Amino acid sequence: MRLLVCLVFLASFAMVCQGHSSGYTRPLRKPSRPIFIRPIGCDVCYGIPSSTARLCCFRYGDCCHLG
């Protein structure tokens, strides 16, 4: 009997981990805001003007440290 209870628990836990809840799975929702693609200057900060670095910092939150 303990083995049966353990197997049922493990099966239900596996279903929860896979996203099943009460036998119904909802479709994935789209993100509420659009995903912006960052310009390459935000990731590679060598040789870009300081105004571009500031723009990336304000718009995308990626602050380039020029040095």
From Swiss-Prot:
Which UniProt keywords are listed? Amidation, Antibiotic, Antimicrobial, Chitin-binding, Disulfide bond, Fungicide, Signal
Q: Note the superkingdom of the native organism.
A: Eukaryota
Kindly list the residue ranges recorded as spanning the membrane: none
Gene Ontology BP, a term: defense response to fungus
Q: Which residues carry this modification: Leucine amide?
A: 66
User: What Gene Ontology molecular-function terms does this entry list?
Assistant: chitin binding
Record-annotated disulphide pairs? 42-56, 45-63, 57-64
Location of the protein in the cell: Cytoplasmic granule
Question: Main subcellular localization, coarse class?
Answer: cytoplasm
Q: Which GO terms describe its cellular component?
A: cytoplasm
Q: In which family does this protein belong, per the annotation?
A: Belongs to the penaeidin family.
Query: What is the documented function of this protein?
Result: Antibacterial and antifungal activity. Presents chitin-binding activity.
| Name this polypeptide is given | Penaeidin-4d
Q: Which organism does this sequence originate in?
A: Penaeus setiferus (Atlantic white shrimp)
